[in-house]
C-alpha cells in the first residue's frame, strides 16, 4: 500500500487517518499514489452522509477479529476499524481515487460567512422541515414542500382546529404526513412557519368580495391576550446542521458472551470507533469546516472528538432517569456502570444530563452545540487561527440567532448554552484518561482509529 504524506503536526501519529482520508469505494479500496495531491471538491450533499450511515445499521456487523496489542516502535497497534462507508469518505469527496478537495479559489472567497452560504447554496436538495420531502422553497419563513405549504395555508385561512387521536406526538414524514393533521400543524408551527404570512382575505379564485366578519373576542388573530410573539424561522445554518445529523448507530453487544467488565468495555470501545468514523464524515458537512486546511481540520477533530461523543450520549439520555444511553440497544444503569468500572465517569456524564435536562435542551441546540464544540477545540496545533476563529464566530452567531427567534422570553439562553461547554470539556478529559488507562492495561481490544485518537488527546 502506497504511503501518503500529509502536512500535519509532527506530534501526532496519523498513519491511520491517512489511510482513511484516501479510502476507496467498495469496488476498489486500494490507495492510489495520486492521493498525495489534495485538491478540494465541492461539498457533498447531506443526503450522502445520511445514506452512508446505514452501513452501521443493526443488520450490519463490526469486524472485531484479528490480533490485538502488538507493540511496534513504541506505538500500540489495534484492530482494523470497520470499513468506511463509500458514499462519504472522511474529509473528502466520493468515488475511487477521488481527490479530497477541489481548488475552489475561483468560487470560494475567504470570508467564512460567504463560505457557509456557498456550501448551503451548493446543496442539491433542500428538505422540507415539516415532513422531510424535497422543499420547493421558503414558504411562510421556512423551507418546505408544496404539500406542507398548501396544508398550512388551508389551515390558517379556514381557521381549522384539529385534534390528535393519540398523544400529540405523531411522527410526521413524507409518507405519514396525512395521518394526523393536528400533529402536522403543530410541526409546522414548531419549525417556525408564520401564521402572519398567510393572507386571510385571499381564497381560491381571487380576493373575497366581502370582508369576513371576525369576532375579535374569540379570534386568536385579533385578541391581544391570545396573540403569541411570532417566532422567527430557523437560522439556515442550524437548519443545515439538522439535515446533516447522522442516523443512529447501534452497539450490537454479543448476546452469546456473558456480562462482564471486559464485555462492557469492549462494546463501548467498538461503538466509539464506529462513531468516530461517522463524526469525521459529519464534520465535513459543517458549513465552513471543509474550507479550513486539512491540518487544521484534523487538529480540531483530534481535540474535540470525545466532547462530541459525550454530547451525543447526553442528548440520547435526556428522557431517562439515572441511565446513560450509549446507543438505543445499550443503556447503562448504576449497577452496570459499577460492573464495567465506569461509575465515576458515568456519574460525571449524568451531571451533564441533569444540567441539559433542566434547560430543556432541544435538538436544534444539540446539533449546534456539537458544531461549536468542534470549532472551539483547545488544540495548540492550529495553523490558521484567524480562519478557525471566524468559523467559531459564525457558529456562535447561528446559536444566538436561533435562540433570539425561538426563545425570546430568555435573552440569555444562548450564553447559558455556551457556559455548559467547559463542563463538557472537563468530562471529556476524564473520559479520555479513563479509556487511555484501559488501553495501557491491555485487557480490552481497541480499533486503530480509536487508539490513535486517544493517543492524540493524551
UniProtKB/Swiss-Prot annotation:
Q: What are the start and end residues of every segment in region (Disordered)?
A: 42-85
Lineage start: Eukaryota, Metazoa, Chordata, Craniata, Vertebrata
Q: In which tissues is it expressed?
A: Expressed in the heart, kidney, brain, lung, bone marrow, adrenal gland, trachea, spinal cord and thyroid gland.
Q: Which residues bind DNA?
A: 125-200
Write out the entry's keywords from A to Z. Answer: Acetylation, Activator, DNA-binding, Isopeptide bond, Metal-binding, Nucleus, Phosphoprotein, Receptor, Transcription, Transcription regulation, Ubl conjugation, Zinc, Zinc-finger
Task: Name the consequence of residue 45 to D.
Answer: No change in sumoylation nor transcriptional activity
Give an example GO molecular function: sequence-specific double-stranded DNA binding
Instruction: State whether it acts alone or in a complex, and with which partners, per the record.
Output: Homodimer. Binds TLE1, PNRC1 and PNRC2. Binds GRIP1. Interacts with NRIP1, NCOA1 and NCOR2.
Show the cross-link location (Glycyl lysine isopeptide (Lys-Gly) (interchain with G-Cter in SUMO)).
40
Instruction: Tell me what else is known.
Output: No physiological activating ligand is known for this orphan receptor, but 4-hydroxytamoxifen and diethylstilbestrol act as inverse agonists and deactivate ESRRG.
What protein name does the entry list? Answer: Estrogen-related receptor gamma
Task: Sum up the protein's function in the record's words.
Answer: Orphan receptor that acts as a transcription activator in the absence of bound ligand. Binds specifically to an estrogen response element and activates reporter genes controlled by estrogen response elements. Induces the expression of PERM1 in the skeletal muscle.
User: In the record, which positions carry Phosphoserine?
Assistant: 45
Q: How is it modified after translation?
A: Acetylated by PCAF/KAT2 (in vitro).
Q: Please list the residue ranges that the record marks as compositionally biased, kind Polar residues.
A: 42-52
**Coiled-coil stretches:** none
Q: Quote the subcellular location field of this record.
A: Nucleus
Q: Specify the effect of residue 45 to A.
A: Abolishes sumoylation. Increased transcriptional activity
Any Gene Ontology CC annotation: chromatin
Domain NR LBD: start-end pairs: 233-457
Q: Which organism is it from?
A: Homo sapiens (Human)
> What is this protein's gene name?
ESRRG
Query: Impact of changing residue 44 to A/E on the protein?
Result: No effect on transcriptional activity
* Residue ranges covered by zinc fingers (NR C4-type): 128-148, 164-188
Amino acid at each position: 500500500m502506497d504511503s501518503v504524506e500529509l502536512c500535519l503536526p509532527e506530534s501526532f501519529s496519523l498513519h491511520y487517518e491517512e489511510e482513511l482520508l484516501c479510502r476507496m469505494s467498495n469496488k476498489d479500496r486500494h490507495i492510489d499514489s495520486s492521493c498525495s495531491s489534495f485538491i478540494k471538491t465541492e461539498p457533498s450533499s447531506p443526503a450522502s452522509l445520511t445514506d452512508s450511515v446505514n452501513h452501521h445499521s443493526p443488520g450490519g456487523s463490526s469486524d472485531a477479529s484479528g490480533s490485538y496489542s502488538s507493540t511496534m516502535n513504541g506505538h500500540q497497534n489495534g484492530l482494523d476499524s470497520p470499513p468506511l462507508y463509500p458514499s462519504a469518505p472522511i474529509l473528502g469527496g466520493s468515488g475511487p481515487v477521488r481527490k479530497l478537495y477541489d481548488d475552489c479559489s475561483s468560487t470560494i472567497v475567504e470570508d467564512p460567512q460567504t463560505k457557509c452560504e456557498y456550501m448551503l447554496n451548493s446543496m442539491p436538495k433542500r428538505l422540507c422541515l415539516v415532513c422531510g420531502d424535497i422543499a420547493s422553497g421558503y414558504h411562510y419563513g421556512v423551507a418546505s414542500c408544496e404539500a406542507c405549504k398548501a396544508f398550512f395555508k388551508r389551515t390558517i385561512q379556514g381557521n381549522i382546529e384539529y385534534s390528535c387521536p393519540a398523544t400529540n406526538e405523531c411522527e410526521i414524514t413524507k409518507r405519514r404526513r396525512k395521518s394526523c393533521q393536528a400533529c402536522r400543524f403543530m410541526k409546522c408551527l414548531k419549525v417556525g412557519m408564520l401564521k402572519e404570512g398567510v393572507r386571510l382575505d385571499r381564497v381560491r379564485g381571487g380576493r373575497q368580495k366581502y370582508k369576513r366578519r371576525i369576532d375579535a373576542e374569540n379570534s386568536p388573530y385579533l385578541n391581544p391576550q391570545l396573540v403569541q410573539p411570532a417566532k422567527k424561522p430557523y437560522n439556515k445554518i442550524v437548519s443545515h446542521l439538522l439535515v446533516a445529523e447522522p442516523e443512529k448507530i447501534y452497539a450490537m453487544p454479543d448476546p452469546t458472551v456473558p456480562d462482564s467488565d471486559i464485555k462492557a468495555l469492549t462494546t463501548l470501545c467498538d461503538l466509539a470507533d464506529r462513531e468516530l468514523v461517522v463524526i469525521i464524515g459529519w464534520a465535513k458537512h459543517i458549513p465552513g469546516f471543509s474550507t479550513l486546511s486539512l491540518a487544521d481540520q484534523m487538529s480540531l477533530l483530534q481535540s474535540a472528538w470525545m466532547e462530541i461523543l459525550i454530547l451525543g450520549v447526553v442528548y440520547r439520555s435526556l428522557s431517562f432517569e439515572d441511565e446513560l444511553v450509549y446507543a438505543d440497544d445499550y443503556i447503562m444503569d448504576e449497577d452496570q456502570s459499577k460492573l464495567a468500572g465506569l461509575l465515576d465517569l458515568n456519574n460525571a456524564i449524568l451531571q451533564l444530563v441533569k444540567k441539559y435536562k433542566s434547560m430543556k435542551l432541544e435538538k436544534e441546540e444539540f446539533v449546534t452545540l456539537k458544531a461549536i464544540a468542534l470549532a472551539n477545540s483547545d488544540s495548540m496545533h492550529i495553523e490558521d487561527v484567524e480562519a478557525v476563529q471566524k468559523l467559531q464566530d459564525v457558529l456562535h452567531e447561528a446559536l444566538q440567532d436561533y435562540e433570539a427567534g425561538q426563545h425570546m422570553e430568555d435573552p440569555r439562553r444562548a450564553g447559558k448554552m455556551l457556559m455548559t461547554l467547559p463542563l463538557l470539556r472537563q468530562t471529556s478529559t476524564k473520559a479520555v484518561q479513563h479509556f487511555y488507562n484501559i488501553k495501557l492495561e491491555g485487557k480490552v481490544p481497541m480499533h486503530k482509529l480509536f487508539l490513535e485518537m486517544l493517543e492524540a488527546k493524551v
